[in-house]
Amino acid sequence: QKEIKPNYAEILKELSSLEIVILDKLFDESNREQNYQKRRQMQFSKQKISEIFKLSNEQADLIIENLYRLNLCQAPAGHGIAVGEYQFALRTTEVFEFTTFGYYFVQSCKWNK
């Protein structure tokens, strides 16, 4: 029997059924890459997700921002832009990545391995 970790159960409560389907699709795509480093760097497009699931820009942003909030996905890492001596990172939902936590969360929740 599959063990679901308690913190995973709490996260499941915070996801809509559509978000779960999207995470499944991201996982299936990520799972094709066996190399951990390459898998970590895989990026997904908001535009492609919007087309597949027929989402408006606003709906896609809400979903992606919720996945960021739950630390299941993240914006791609970058060095940002320097303004004077201060650097800041650009925040985007146009392109996003699975976090390692997100990948293992979906793996733990999948019943049909």
Question: Where is each model-derived feature located?
Answer:
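Short amphipathic alpha-helical interface segments
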Residues: E3-F53
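Short, hydrophobic/aromatic alpha-helical segments in well-folded domains
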Residues: N7-I11, I63, F101
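Charged/polar positions within long, soluble alpha-helices
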Residues: F27, R69-L72, Q107
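Short, solvent-exposed loop/turn segments at secondary-structure junctions
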Residues: N31-R32, A82-G84
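Short amphipathic alpha-helical interaction segments
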Residues: S50-A82, R91-T93
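Short, amphipathic alpha-helical interaction segments positioned at domain boundaries
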Residues: E85-K113
